[in-house]
């Protein structure tokens, strides 16, 4: 709307004549109309069409810019050895190589065909080799490989011009970035991921450096080596031969892939160990930790100095008193040692004197057997007689004749043998008394009121080992455990359990072995496998699984089983087969059975402890 003019302002009015309307027909033309028709036919937006136009124009510009490079050795190539030729060089794309587009490859092939086709050369008067032996076959093979994305990818993976070398640690120490940056840039072409981090420079932060090395330590490579397969499965005459060729090729590819990943890992390791930024970050972190450590150490040192000053006087007094006691004890021990040495030398001298005297008299016999027997008796005297007895015997031998000496020696031998016999009888009587008391104790059960069967004794031993010293309310827990698992029906109190445990500790080792042997014999009797009758008319089945091992588990086997259970979690395929392999001498069935037993033991242990805990809470 126009603003109305004021009173003092002048108003101008312009009038003119308009020509009459004329109807005419216009046809749309031009590149804009053509673009509109394309968008309408393809049902796309204008922005999408602009992107495609830019892409086509960029490809056309690239196609216009590249120039084919003539391969001078093209005519000398052997068509039969086409697999070892450089396909990019054959098509004149030696400089572009893996960067060449499909349009460029097609254009290069077209140009090579126009120039080297046998018909063209024959028309020009050139001598042509008939069949597939002409070098033009190499051009056809090169285009066949490079036009197929899968085959081209395989050839690019073993590009003969690619430099697989990596810098050593010593090369990277002098000029790290110049040595490693082009190598990482060169090897980044094998990555499946597009956003590849750069090596950076000395100003890169620790997050960027960590991200770079994390990417390369987890490098995902698409490089594969199927082009180097020595055997072609298409040449196989039968299915078995084709499978064998495929197996050999897969093994060779896996080995080359492994070597490639080792090469990449070595590159990253060399770079990481030579990277000056890593060294700088480590030094900074070390300095920070040392500063914190020093501050804490200073605080602790000041606190300790005060305590040390207070304890120093007490420690000094204790030290002096201890040194005095040690010196007195040392002097006393030295005196005792000297006395023992003197006595030992005297006994040794008297023993040797006795042996010499008896030897001079040929051990009082001309019979060799009697001499040997007397020699044994003389050695027994040397071992049993005290110093005074040896001296007395030697003095009597020195002043007596052979017969008198023999009588003196035989008398001494008789006394020693009689003493040995008395000691043996006393020991046998003591052992018999101990055995009798242990049997009465085992029958009475310690408390004298409740009998203990062999099953209850074994259950008690198992419970004592299951709940070691230090367990909260240990004997109450053991009593509850026995009451839950005993088949005798007798209820045991903590006092009964303690008395019986003490009586078992006093048993002779031989009696303990007898009890364990009886328990094991009973176990074998209860778990004896009854052989099944086999019908001769029916073929017997073959079971591949090994029989369960009924022998008890050793401590070493138990440790191996526990380690295997940690190593192979529940979601591991074929878990129990792997666990059985980790425990030598045990089958899968043995391991599963032992695991169930351990689970039941743990559940029983928890149940017994919870019962005692609940009873304690109720009393409170």
UniProtKB/Swiss-Prot annotation:
Places the protein is found: Nucleus; Cytoplasm, Cytosol
Look up keyword Ion transport and say if it applies.
Answer: no
Q: What does this protein do?
A: Acts both as a chaperone in the cytosol and as a chromatin regulator in the nucleus. When cytosolic, acts as a molecular chaperone: component of the ribosome-associated complex (RAC), a complex involved in folding or maintaining nascent polypeptides in a folding-competent state. When nuclear, mediates the switching from polycomb-repressed genes to an active state: specifically recruited at histone H2A ubiquitinated at 'Lys-119' (H2AK119ub), and promotes the displacement of the polycomb PRC1 complex from chromatin, thereby facilitating transcription activation.
Chaperone listed as a keyword: yes
Annotated organism of origin:
Xenopus tropicalis
Q: Which InterPro entries match?
A: DnaJ_domain, DnaJ_domain_CS, Homeodomain-like_sf, J_dom_sf, Myb_dom, RAC_head, RAC_head_sf, SANT/Myb
Disordered: region residues: 284-309, 420-450
Q: What is this protein called?
A: DnaJ homolog subfamily C member 2
GO molecular function terms noted in the UniProt entry: chromatin binding; histone binding; Hsp70 protein binding; ribosome binding; ubiquitin-modified histone reader activity
Domain (J) ranges: 86-159
Q: Where is the SANT domain?
A: 447-509, 548-603
- Regions of biased composition (Basic and acidic residues) lie at 420-431
Question: Record's SMART domains?
Answer: DnaJ, SANT
| Subunit annotation | Component of ribosome-associated complex (RAC).
Q: Which PANTHER family match?
A: DNAJ HOMOLOG SUBFAMILY C MEMBER 2 (PTHR43999:SF1)
Keywords, alphabetical: Activator, Chaperone, Chromatin regulator, Cytoplasm, Nucleus, Repeat, Transcription, Transcription regulation
């Amino acid at each position: 709307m126009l603003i109305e003019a004021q009173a003092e302002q002048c108003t101008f009015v312009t009038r003119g004549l308009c020509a009459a309307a004329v109807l005419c027909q216009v046809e749309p033309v031009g590149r804009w109309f053509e673009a509109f028709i394309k968008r309408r036919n393809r049902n796309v937006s204008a922005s999408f069409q602009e992107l495609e136009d830019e892409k086509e124009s960029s490809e056309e510009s690239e196609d216009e810019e590249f120039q084919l490079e003539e391969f001078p050795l093209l005519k000398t190539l052997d068509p039969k050895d086409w697999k070892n030729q450089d396909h990019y060089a054959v098509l004149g794309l030696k400089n572009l190589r893996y960067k060449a587009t499909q349009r460029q490859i097609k254009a290069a092939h077209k140009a090579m065909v126009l120039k080297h086709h046998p018909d063209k050369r024959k028309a020009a008067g050139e001598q042509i080799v008939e069949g597939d032996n002409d070098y033009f076959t190499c051009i056809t093979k090169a285009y066949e490989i490079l036009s197929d994305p899968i085959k081209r990818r395989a050839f690019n993976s073993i590009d003969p011009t690619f430099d697989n070398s990596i810098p050593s640690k010593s090369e990277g120490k002098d000029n790290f970035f110049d040595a490693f940056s082009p190598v990482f840039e060169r090897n980044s072409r094998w990555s499946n991921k597009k956003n590849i981090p750069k090596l950076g420079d000395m100003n890169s932060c620790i997050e960027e450096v960590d991200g770079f090395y994390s990417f390369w330590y987890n490098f995902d490579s698409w490089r594969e080596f199927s082009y180097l397969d020595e055997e072609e499965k298409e040449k196989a005459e039968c299915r078995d031969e084709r499978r064998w060729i495929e197996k050999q090729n897969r093994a060779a590819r896996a080995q080359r892939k492994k070597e490639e990943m080792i090469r990449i890992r070595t590159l990253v390791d060399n770079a990481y160990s030579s990277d000056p930024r890593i060294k700088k970050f480590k030094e900074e972190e070390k300095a920070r930790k040392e500063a914190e450590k020093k501050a804490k150490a200073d605080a602790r040192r000041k606190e300790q100095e005060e305590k040390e000053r207070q304890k120093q006087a007490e420690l000094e007094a204790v030290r002096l008193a201890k040194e005095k006691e040690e010196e007195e004890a040392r002097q006393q021990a030295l005196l005792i040692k000297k006395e023992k040495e003197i006595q030992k030398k005297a006994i040794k001298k008297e023993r040797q004197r006795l042996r010499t005297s008896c030897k001079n008299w040929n051990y009082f016999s001309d019979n060799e057997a009697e001499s040997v027997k007397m020699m044994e008796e003389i050695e027994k005297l040397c071992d049993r007689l005290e110093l005074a007895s040896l001296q007395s015997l030697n003095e009597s031998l020195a002043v007596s004749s052979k017969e008198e000496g023999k009588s003196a020696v035989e008398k001494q031998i008789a006394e020693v043998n009689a003493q040995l016999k008395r000691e043996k009888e006393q020991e046998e009587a003591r052992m018999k008394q101990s055995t009798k008391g242990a049997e009465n104790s085992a029958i009475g059960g310690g408390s004298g009121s409740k009998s203990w069967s062999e099953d209850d004794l074994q259950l008690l031993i198992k419970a004592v080992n299951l709940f070691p010293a230090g367990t909260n309310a240990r004997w109450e827990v053991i009593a509850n455990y026995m009451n839950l698992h005993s088949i005798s029906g007798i209820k045991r109190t903590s006092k009964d359990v303690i008395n019986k445990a003490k009586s078992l500790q006093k048993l002779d080792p031989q009696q303990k072995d007898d009890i364990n042997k009886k328990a094991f014999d009973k176990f074998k009797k209860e778990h004896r496998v009854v052989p099944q009758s086999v019908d001769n008319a029916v073929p017997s089945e073959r079971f591949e699984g090994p029989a369960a091992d009924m022998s008890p588990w050793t401590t070493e086997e138990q440790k191996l089983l526990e380690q295997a259970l940690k190593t192979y979690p529940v979601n591991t395929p074929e878990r129990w087969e792997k666990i059985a392999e980790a425990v030598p001498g045990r089958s899968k069935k043995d391991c599963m059975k032992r695991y169930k037993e351990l689970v039941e033991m743990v559940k029983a242990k928890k149940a017994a402890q919870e019962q005692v805990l609940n009873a304690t809470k109720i009393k409170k």
